[in-house]
């Protein structure tokens, strides 16, 4: 709608398709964690501009045991406190989780990041993002209760299948009875 008011036209495609194509063409986005590190402060903007291609690239990096993206959790020595590089990615996923359309994919990415997260100095971790997104009394998503419940169940099943990692996201299971739907 805004592109119409700004009289922004792209021949042969919508402006969203144009932006998606640009993000898809970023070299290394789907196979080099260093790009995510270098773009850390811009990742929320990139994710909001082209959610599909952003999630596609991240899901590619998270394939297998996540070794391709695990280095973003490394902490560098800072002047006073250590510096970590995962915050921009986490904030991008939190922003996408507000939209029901992207909630499942964002939640799965956060859960996979939580599984490979070795912990560290900061308490603001991917697991805490999942908690705040699905918080029963104040969820950080616009998705209705039924959708949130279904996603929590899918996450529980998905990570049960992966085996040995379910304990990290086991906090989700008790939330299901707390989130009651209206009859």
Regions found by a protein language model. Give the residues of each.
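Non-catalytic all-alpha helical scaffold/repeat segments
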Residues: 1-183
């Amino acid at each position: 709608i805004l592109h119409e008011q700004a009289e922004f036209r792209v021949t042969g495609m919508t402006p969203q398709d144009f932006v998606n194509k640009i993000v898809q063409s970023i070299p290394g986005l789907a196979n080099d964690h260093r790009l995510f590190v270098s773009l850390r402060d811009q990742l929320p903007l990139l994710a909001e501009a082209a959610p599909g291609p952003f999630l596609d690239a991240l899901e590619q990096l998270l394939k297998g045991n996540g070794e391709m993206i695990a280095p973003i959790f490394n902490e560098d020595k800072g002047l006073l406190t250590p510096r970590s590089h995962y915050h921009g990615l986490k904030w991008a996923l939190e922003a996408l989780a507000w939209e029901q359309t992207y909630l499942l994919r964002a939640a799965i990415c956060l859960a996979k990041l939580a599984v490979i997260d070795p912990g560290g100095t900061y308490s603001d971790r991917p697991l805490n993002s999942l908690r705040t997104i699905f918080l029963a009394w104040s969820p950080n998503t616009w998705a209705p209760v039924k959708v949130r419940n279904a996603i929590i169940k899918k996450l529980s099943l998905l990570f049960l299948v992966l085996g040995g990692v379910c304990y990290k996201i086991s906090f989700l299971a008790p939330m299901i009875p707390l989130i009651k739907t209206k009859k």
